[in-house]
Amino acid sequence: MRPYEIMVILDPTLDECTVGPSLETFLNVVRKDGGAIDKVDIWGRRRLAYEISKHAEGIYVVIDLKAAPATVSELDRQLSLNESVLRTKVMRTDKH
């Protein structure tokens, strides 16, 4: 298991109250494969540096988790298939 941080930018037309429950369906992929979700931090609606899919704003979510590399790539794949996800960024958070 490796520690990861995933930043997800969601469509700003979504209701911010539904962001957490909708992400839970994706995070179940990590739990099924024996990973652990450490923290889900919903930053809320923020202005983007440049437009993505004709949106000037997005709802930012940062997820800290521990999982196998294959599990994280599957989670990233499933997130990218969702139309309400504008962008994802996966980073390993190992301390050297």
Curated annotation (Swiss-Prot):
Keyword flag Ribosomal protein: yes
Pfam families: Ribosomal_S6
InterPro entries: Ribosomal_bS6 (IPR000529), Ribosomal_bS6_CS (IPR020815), Ribosomal_bS6_sf (IPR035980), Ribosomal_S6_plastid/chlpt (IPR020814), Transl_elong_EF1B/ribsomal_bS6 (IPR014717)
Keywords assigned: Ribonucleoprotein, Ribosomal protein, RNA-binding, rRNA-binding
One annotated Gene Ontology cellular component of this protein: ribosome
Function text: Binds together with bS18 to 16S ribosomal RNA.
Family annotation (HAMAP family): Ribosomal_bS6
Name under which the protein is recorded: Small ribosomal subunit protein bS6
Protein species of origin: Mycobacterium leprae (strain TN)
Lineage: Bacteria, Bacillati, Actinomycetota, Actinomycetes, Mycobacteriales
Gene: rpsF
